[in-house]
């Protein structure tokens, strides 16, 4: 068990993990947080699904503008937490150029990870059944389908279909967060 003296104190930072639905954002975010804890850092994980639930928001029929407004709420929450020295790992879609630009200018020690998974692969995985429900006309306003997603043009790390070495990828992200 670690003692208080083993806890690392860092300046606040934000690791923003983004990609389309089903890309693996939550999984990667959880792995990064676990690895940070192993390093003696006490991070916070903000997951888009959990945040929407906590805020009582359903995005199933959200317009692009409403999703953008919610993404700014997430970004501002990250800024608030990081300004108090918190290491924030956020796993959320928020695929808007406006958000990417704002984050780069306003979030301290910002590190952006883009999970660049082809739509064909996401439809095959369809872990939440979203793409199937979309094809049946049950849901609308799905990023990458109904409306175009703005993929990050300056992500610090881009991950393709399969992570060759998941441990190495998590380690790379953690090193960046720790400033190594």
Regions found by a protein language model. Give the residues of each.
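Extreme N-terminal, non-catalytic leader segments
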Residues: 1-15
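The conserved Walker
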Residues: 21
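Conserved lysine of the Walker
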Residues: 25
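Conserved substrate/cofactor phosphate-moiety recognition/catalytic segment
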Residues: 30-79
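Conserved nucleotide-binding/hydrolysis micro-motifs of P-loop NTPases
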Residues: 50-52, 94-97, 116-121, 164-165
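Glycine-rich phosphate-binding loop used to anchor ATP phosphates in small-molecule kinases
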Residues: 65-111, 132
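Conserved phosphate-donor/acceptor-positioning beta-strand/loop module used by diverse small-molecule
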Residues: 89-91, 106-125, 159
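Small-molecule kinase domains that catalyze NTP-dependent phosphoryl transfer to phosphate-bearing small molecules
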Residues: 124-172, 179-180
């Amino acid at each position: 068990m670690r003692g208080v003296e083993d806890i690392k104190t860092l300046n606040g930072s934000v690791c923003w993990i983004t990609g389309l639905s089903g890309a693996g954002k939550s999984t990667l975010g959880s792995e990064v947080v676990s690895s940070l804890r192993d390093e003696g850092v006490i991070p916070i994980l903000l997951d888009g699904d959990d945040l929407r639930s906590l805020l009582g928001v359903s995005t199933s029929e959200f317009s692009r503008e409403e999703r953008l407004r919610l993404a700014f709420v997430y970004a501002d929450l990250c800024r608030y937490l990081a300004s108090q020295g918190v290491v924030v790992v956020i796993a959320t879609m928020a695929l808007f150029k406006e958000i990417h630009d704002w984050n780069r200018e306003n979030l301290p020690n910002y590190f952006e990870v883009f999970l660049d998974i082809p739509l064909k692969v996401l439809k095959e995985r369809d872990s939440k059944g979203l793409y199937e429900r979309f094809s049946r006309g049950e849901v609308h306003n799905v990023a990458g389908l109904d409306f175009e997603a703005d993929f990050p043009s300056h992500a610090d790390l881009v991950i393709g279909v399969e992570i060759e070495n998941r441990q190495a990828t998590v380690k790379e992200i953690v090193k960046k967060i720790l400033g190594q």
